[in-house]
Every structure is written in structure tokens, then in C-alpha cells.
Amino acid sequence: MILSTTPTLEGKTIREYRGIVVGEAILGANVFKDLFAGIRDIIGGRSGAYEKELARAREIAFDELKERAAALGANAVVGIDIDYEVVGQSGSMLMVSISGTAVLV
């Protein structure tokens, strides 16, 4: 599966547009509790534990995006956009949302 943030793929011709696809992952409040408990991981203003959880959420969202594109018969996703949103009561959860257009090249 080819993934790209650009609307076209250099050297490839988009033969068919299959539709918009989305992948999402939400980190719950317990993750943030664990992250803040591990505040000692912060070195130089960065939290290794927090970054690891964000990477895991991104991976889950990308996997979901690819599964949905494949279900539409696509072999690529173009125009990918990644958004991070704080959601839930008093910002207790973080949502990673990835969207793009499933295409056949």
C-alpha cells in the first residue's frame, strides 16, 4: 500500500478514485495518568513515554486507514492528513485521526 501526503504520486497514474478513508485511535485517560506518573522520563522537554504512546496511536490509525483502503480495492492513499485532537471531559483523551483518498494506481 502506497501512502502519500501529496495529491498525486510521481511516476504513477491514478486510474481510479475509490473514496475517502479514515483511521482513528484514541488514547484514554489511563494512558495520560501513566504518562504523568512517568514524568521523570522528561529529558530536555520531551517525554519518551508520551512519544511512544503517540507513535502507537499513529500506527493503529495508519493500520486502520490501510485496511479501509484495501477493502475499497485501492492500492494507495493520497492526500493524507494527520490530526491530533484533545477530546473528552477536561481533555482526558487524545485522538489521532488520519484521512486521505483511496486510489488505484
Curated annotation (Swiss-Prot):
InterPro entries: UPF0145_dom_sf, UPF0145_YbjQ-like. It holds the Pfam family YbjQ_1. Coiled coil: none annotated. It comes from the Bacteria. HAMAP family: UPF0145 (MF_00338). Belongs to the UPF0145 family. NCBIfam families: PRK02877.1. This is UPF0145 protein AHA_2580. The lineage of its organism: Bacteria, Pseudomonadati, Pseudomonadota, Gammaproteobacteria, Aeromonadales.
